Curated annotation (Swiss-Prot):
NCBIfam families: rpmD_bact. Belongs to the universal ribosomal protein uL30 family. Transmembrane segments: none annotated. The gene is rpmD. The keyword Ribosomal protein applies. This is Large ribosomal subunit protein uL30. It comes from Streptococcus pyogenes serotype M1.
Length: 60
């Protein structure tokens, strides 16, 4: 299955609690931290909810 790299580019400070929890659930901590996750519907939904805070790249 394909993988995606998710990078936190903006701070979740001052955002809604649901958005902050989503950032933590993805395993992102500090700014510019990155994680590689499987590309599935659940992860895509989480990324969509915080798309204004993260950047997404395909991993080969």
């Amino acid at each position: 299955m394909a993988q995606i790299k998710i990078t936190l580019t903006k701070s979740p400070i001052g955002r809604k609690p649901e958005q902050r929890k989503t950032v933590v659930a993805l395993g992102l901590g500090k700014l510019n931290s990155s994680v590689v996750k499987e590309d599935n519907a659940a992860i895509r939904g989480m990324v969509t909810a915080i798309s204004h805070l993260v950047t997404v790249e395909d991993v080969k």
